[in-house]
Curated annotation (Swiss-Prot):
NCBIfam families: mnmG_gidA (TIGR00136). Gene3D superfamilies: FAD/NAD(P)-binding domain, GidA associated domain, C-terminal subdomain, tRNA uridine 5-carboxymethylaminomethyl modification enzyme MnmG/GidA. The keyword Transmembrane helix does not apply. Keywords: Cytoplasm, FAD, Flavoprotein, NAD, tRNA processing. Disulfide bonds: none annotated. InterPro entries: FAD/NAD-bd_sf (IPR036188), GIDA_C_N (IPR049312), MnmG (IPR004416), MnmG-rel (IPR002218), MnmG-rel_CS (IPR020595), MnmG_C (IPR026904), MnmG_C_subdom (IPR047001), MnmG_C_subdom_sf (IPR044920). GO terms for cellular component: cytosol. The gene is mnmG. GO terms for molecular function: flavin adenine dinucleotide binding. Its cofactor is FAD. It is found in: Cytoplasm. This is tRNA uridine 5-carboxymethylaminomethyl modification enzyme MnmG. GO terms for biological process: tRNA methylation; tRNA wobble uridine modification.
Amino acid sequence: MLYPTEFDVIVVGGGHAGTEAALASARMGAKTLLLTHNIETLGQMSCNPSIGGIGKGHLVKEVDALGGAMAAATDEGGIQFRILNSSKGPAVRATRAQADRVLYKQAIRRRLENQPNLWLFQQAVDDLMVEGDRVVGAVTQVGVRFRARAVVLTAGTFLDGKIHVGLNHYTGGRAGDPAAVSLSSRLKELNLPQGRLKTGTPPRIDGRTIDFSKLDEQPGDLDPIPVFSFLGRAEQHPQQLPCWVTHTNERTHDIIRSGLDRSPMYTGVIEGVGPRYCPSIEDKIHRFASKDSHQIFLEPEGLTTNEFYPNGISTSLPFDVQLALVHSMRGLEQAHILRPGYAIEYDYFDPRALKSSLETKAIGGLFFAGQINGTTGYEEAAAQGLLAGINAGRYAQEKDAWCPRRDQAYLGVLVDDLVTRGVSEPYRMFTSRAEYRLSLREDNADMRLTEIGRELGVVDDVRWDAFNRKRDAVSRETERLRTTWVTPKTLPVDEATALLGKPIDHEYSLAELLRRPGVSYDGVCGLRGGECGPSEPLAEDELLLAQIKEQIEIGIKYQGYIERQAGEIERNGANENTRLPDGIDYTEVRGLSFEVSQKLNQFRPETIGQASRISGMTPAAISLLMVHLKKRGLGRRKGTDSVPGADVQADNTAAQQ
């Protein structure tokens, strides 16, 4: 048998975006090839050993709801789990986990090697095969040519990557890996708009040289221990470890200031812009000069290593300065640095040159995902990779592209922000970026997306069965609470007083009682007349039971707010999803200013909603566009054709609550 050289989809890069892209397209039945420069680094956590966080955890849950691997791999490799913002409302609660780098990478590789329709091949890609205005394949560094209907490029920080430590620099995709110089040059020939960004990583420390007696311990959540995947179990977690906390001080800051004359950031050597929300320690000292201390988290890298990741001191200062600043902190006076911190500059491409499917507008069948689009973070990369993989598979199968709306998923917010607003610095997801965050919670990601994922072909039978059991149980139990009543005669005074603080004076449904502050689902079910709850085999599944209770309680307690938000979504959606024709010349739209028509012709928004979010767009311009479309009978609602998920949002409103 000849070695296969023709595929439906080729994925270039084996990081968080590439692995999710390859798995997604293969799950859909597309014959997929994953090309990576080193099979041993598939799924590698290049920077921090953690997954999740505010906004990021929401993306991981959405990837999981669509059948992705990140959440499940984190459950298998996670060595500490916490719920952030646990005392706040459900919209901003977020899961975060420390992961054993080796276990996480093994979990990802195991899934890749056992995924039907997926081939792996270790070779860097030096060239893309482009015929006319579409991509038709990729060429490896030794000249092997693979053809495909679609190519997903997930190059991370490797495109013309340059690593900086002090005033020394060298080419590299990350420490120990070569940069993709030839591929970068080839992409520049395609005249896609591009720029340079920068990110960084801290020095790593040998835990045997840390004095933990001087540090504050930060354990994970233990009762209950969180899980990331909707199918996960706490029993899957390996041994759990604490993190530790120290702080910078005035001496630390003086050491950093003394080295700024040899900092590549402050001497103009680095041209790329770094991430605003994950700044280097030298940037923190400069931007927050009045602050005399910064918190530093010492995070274990795994169960079989002594290496610690000091979260909060990402730096590109010279090594002698790195050593001095580490030794200036409490508990690290004798610390041995195993690896120096560094900054890395790399090419990215303006995401406004992409469709919402993450396909480039200029070259058919070429998809970009991850840091190549100007984002930062494993979670943002994985979410984009999943979407690009789905749409590359659909492109190869000659089906319409799919992308969730802003009111459907954080993934929709992420993509819409990228393709309409672009980036001037590495983009990080936050809950504050979503207009409808009460509807886009971690706990209901499956209710929002799993049915769509099933239609797309990325959700398997096991997940689909678990989802249906949960959805049906939530619906049945919510209805029971709304139709079960207690009266002053049936509810003893002592029970009412214990739960509500006073006896009831008239008839209430259990749902009405649950809506009161401080009243829990278990408390209501403990009342005389309120007994029951999810039954049959569900009660034996503790995790599923906990998920069901959480959905019911949030849905009932926040019902008014959720319904109000749903009404707002419906009102705003009237024009939000109206498509703009591909070939429209905006200079011919009467009344539009030259500036507005120029921007519309440059960025080619797909919908009225996207057009409204372009910088400089005015309400008057949007009104003129709507008049133009109506006069010519153009425009249709996005999602009203054969694209999956067109009707799922409305059908699942009650289940989401």
